[in-house]
Amino acid sequence: MYNVKIENTGRYVPDNIVTNEDISKIVDTNDKWIRERTGIKERRISKGENTSHMAIKSAKDVLRKSSIKADELDLIIVATCTPDCFVPSTACIVQDAIGATKATCFDINAACTGFMYALSVASQFIKSGQSKNALVIGAETLSKMINWQDRGTCVLFADGAGAAILTRSEEVGLISQYTCSDGTGGKFLKCDALPVENPYVSEKTEFLNKLSMEGREVFKFAVNAMIDSVHKVLEKTDYTIEDIDYIVPHQANIRIIEYVAKKLKVSQDKFYINLHRYGNTSGASIPIALDEMNEKNMLKKGDKIILVGFGGGLTFGAHLIQWN
């Protein structure tokens, strides 16, 4: 078995900044209401760029900083629940755009936990020897699945992409991982795809292709799932929460993060938070945050970092990584 590390990171967000004041012109809300309930001040919303466009730009960003070239990649995984199309996969579109001709490519849909799942899968490919260099991307255009008349969701979600290159390493980079799902709660966060319509269907089914969310149920699930994931990922090691330098949570809601910090008995200063600027970008939120930290030179060799997320499905999970 080989060791795996994150070799570098990248990100891309649309230029279009939508403030809470802008949202208040669309639905009955205001800046104070949004900030107090979510912690969000502004978010990035696409003016036409689709998921693959943002995924490609985040891929080019990480490749620009990496010592690994596109033709050295042998695996590309894109985590998204908002692909451009059913076929081809977003990963294949990225492959074509960056010239990664030797890569196996596929998408993963675990909603906001997608990047956690993709990291887990990519690391297993590398550990087993099947791959050496993997590009993992979380990319979402949530603005196209939002009901812009529903203030409970349209104030939260946004667009963006984050990327990381994983590579075989002599040093341990990905220390432990934990992923889990609870399909019984799938109805709490949902967006339909296409209805079954063909000459043999006699009755039309109810169909809603916009995101719906039961906020209270998602909150209860989220805080418990994140706390459980942190405990589970630490249980597999000799480390305790005191050994952790940073926690990078899914950037969903400041109240969730505050509650988790309190229950873990950890200072909120240990949590990297940027949701006030980007909103909830689903599977892109953790890699965007990680790249910001990397760009700011916050991460030092040997730092222990927990990445932890939750999302529709319901899905949840965490990774304990050591920065190399």
Curated annotation (Swiss-Prot):
Protein's gene: fabH
InterPro entries noted in UniProt: ACP_syn_III_C, ACP_syn_III_N, FabH, Thiolase-like
Segments of this protein annotated with the region ACP-binding: 251-255
Species for this entry: Clostridium novyi (strain NT)
Catalyzed reactions per annotation: malonyl-[ACP] + acetyl-CoA + H(+) = 3-oxobutanoyl-[ACP] + CO2 + CoA
Pathway in which the depicted protein is active: Lipid metabolism; fatty acid biosynthesis
Quaternary data: Homodimer.
Record protein name field: Beta-ketoacyl-[acyl-carrier-protein] synthase III
Cellular compartment(s): Cytoplasm
Signal peptide annotation: none
Enzyme class at the top of the EC tree: transferase
Pfam families for this protein: ACP_syn_III, ACP_syn_III_C
One example of a Gene Ontology biological process annotation: secondary metabolite biosynthetic process
GO CC annotation terms, alphabetical: cytoplasm
Keywords: Acyltransferase, Cytoplasm, Fatty acid biosynthesis, Fatty acid metabolism, Lipid biosynthesis, Lipid metabolism, Multifunctional enzyme, Transferase
Lineage: superkingdom: Bacteria
Residues annotated as the enzyme's active site: 112, 250, 280
Family: Belongs to the thiolase-like superfamily. FabH family.
